[in-house]
Amino acid sequence: EKELYKKHWIVMILQDVRTAVDAACLGLEILSIIKQNDLPLEFPPQVIEASKRVPKSIKQSELEGRRDLRDLPIVTVDGDDAKDLDDAVYVKQLGKDEFLLGVHIADVSYYVKENAVLDKEARERGTSVYLVDRVLPMLPERLSNGICSLNAGEDRLTMSCEMHIDRKAVSYTHLRAHETCA
């Protein structure tokens, strides 16, 4: 019985070692992909400093002139583990075959001004890169996961497009875009 316990214990240790080795190999593969594609792991100091100057929350004055959609059941369409929630939708049935579809994206341009250091870095990166174990964001996390993320229960500035859809005609009859808060 003691020998059986010893063998079982050794097998358990070997399984743990194999799991650790597999994880390390995956980590090395991901780092290799990052290196091969010259993907930046960090932001330059001036970009981090610029991101710190962006407010963490919206002021009441920033809502003026925007259509208020905060009372609508708008839902994000990102994955469960996503932290950079930048797009959301709302659907309302208007009639038997008619719907209003609202598509909402974070109004990043309100905070990231053209040709500013944040804009130049975002253009250089082009997109956020989603890897198995991490995200290499286009903007610092203070923005991408913060003020520019459509987090539940938090007021955010958005750009919205509403489409009036007729299911019978399989077309939309009205398209309207506007600055909003959601």
Predicted regions and their residues:
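Phosphate/diphosphate-binding loops
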Residues: 158-159, 163
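Single conserved hydrophobic/aromatic residue that forms the stacking wall/gate
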Residues: 174-182
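Short acidic-glycine loop/turn motifs at beta-strand connectors
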Residues: 93-95, 165-170
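Charge-lined substrate channels and their catalytic hotspots, especially those that engage the 3′ end
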Residues: 1-102, 109-154
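Low-complexity basic/metal-binding stretches
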Residues: 8, 171-172
